[in-house]
């Protein structure tokens, strides 16, 4: 007798998502034809909003499409019809449904930049490409002309921040040059959509903290990969910090636009939201998501974010500095230069060397071998200001001074890049 096999969790997930897809398409279209203001789509979305596997299968079914030679997801007709139904729906008759839809897109986005591995075995080989397509469609839709900031509930803001946080390469590209990858542009996404979406949730502290966390992790990974190269030098570190500064300035400018348009310019709410999010970006950029405690890190899946983060939990976990984020980022770059051994130990260019003068400060620490091992995330606001003064006044060796000045100029240039992108190249729809 042949033994019956039990369905696996993955098969059950696919079955649930497919049922939601078929029922949602069928009954949803019938209800609209009958003029009904209620259908099963809301129920289907609500049922899978906290299930990333089912959410991804609903928005980009694995069996309905393929990955092309460039790694881009090419959807089938069922997927196209699904998105046509979702994006043409009269959501004003289903306002709670937008909360559910954004929860589903946020959950699905947690498969961005993930691949099958021993530590992540349930991820399919197509998951990243499918999630990129779903994120592109979602960001294009909610950042497009069909919505305004007034349409966004606080729940929508937090959910959509997860989508953007899990699309950090697109945010970073929009901050410096505006050229997005094929995986999202094939779904209709433009850099202006990203700017508009961030602008629309830019007044929500939890949403901005969530975005800053995802973006910080992206820059942390890039910096770590770059500087682990044996041939890496101060130019590579400077380029990395220029990109961090551009992302930071881009977020700051878009959030400040939102507060200004709401007649809250320079308010305490603006200062708290902006400074907190940028300080989180700095801290996670330096240490990565591993710096979060179990409570705050419970929202992550691998190196992505599965649910909106709570700002207070993140800042409590990081012990985020209350100082000026811009000064803090510059100080981090100087300290990183010390940690990576980019300063001279025998320069004959005169003056006091960086490594010698740094030892006089309370932020300086060494490992057991006597090498600099400074915790860049632990710098207080006063210590960051002290590090800036150290660069300016105490390091007089011309070789070391040149490295510090180049890092300083890189961050200044990145700050300009991000601001220019938000104000001109990729200016948001300020509606």
Question: Residue ranges of each PLM-predicted region?
Answer:
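Non-catalytic all-alpha helical scaffold/repeat segments
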Residues: 26-430
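N-terminal export and membrane-targeting signals
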Residues: 1-18, 270
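Hydrophobic core
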Residues: 21-25
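Intrinsic structural disorder
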Residues: 1-5, 424, 431
